[in-house]
Amino acid sequence: MSGHSKWNNIKRKKEKADGAKAKIFTKIGRELAVAVKQGGGPDPNSNSKLKELIAKAKAANVPNDNIERIIKKAAGEGEADNYESITYEGYGPSGVAVIVETLTDNRNRTAGEVRHYFDKFGGNLGTSGCVSFMFQQKGVLIVEKEDLDEDKVMEDCLEAGAADFQADEDVFEIYTEPSDFSGVLEDLTAKGYEFVSAEVEMVPDTYTSLPDEDTAVKMQKLLDALEDNDDVQNVWHNWENPDND
């Protein structure tokens, strides 16, 4: 896997999120609420999906008070019951693999909008399974290097049960099996680590480059349109963007 590309994708998403915190908080809040309603209740100790999303929310700087309020509200009656999770797969320009995870209360609206974005920017929406085989689901934890000792961090990660560890220029990237994510997260948090990003993600086996600037611009516009859509929670892809190097 290309960890360098992974971190660059995260940096781009976080830089974009800094300019749209309200929308990011709303999307994560919806995920939290649905996890409580549909995933096993408000206790993260017995709801592994909720535990994962709390980690994601904290890494995105969602205030603890907001997280607690969302969970408490979702434990009662609410609109989260109306949402369903739908994943779309397709191809961007030049065959870039794209996975789009959504939470929607109107699947026809969401499907139409997602299809429109693919068509508009030189891609096409595919069938279920058409690109997901190119990805592996992994827990991904990103820690800024700062003054941390690489050998010590690697030792702590392996002791915690991480499957892979990589040192990038600015960060340490820690990969886990999905089932081990919560345990590794808890262990490293207890040791004082703070995370730039913490989430179970779809990580591509390989990354692909685009042939020219015009194609890259279309790909970026496709990603922006998808990520800006209120129903879209996550967008995973295997484009290696040289502008992020």
Predicted feature residues:
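Positively charged, low-complexity, intrinsically disordered RNA-binding extensions
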Residues: 140-245
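N-terminal cationic and glycine-rich segments that engage phosphates or anionic surfaces
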Residues: 1-126, 131, 136-140, 237
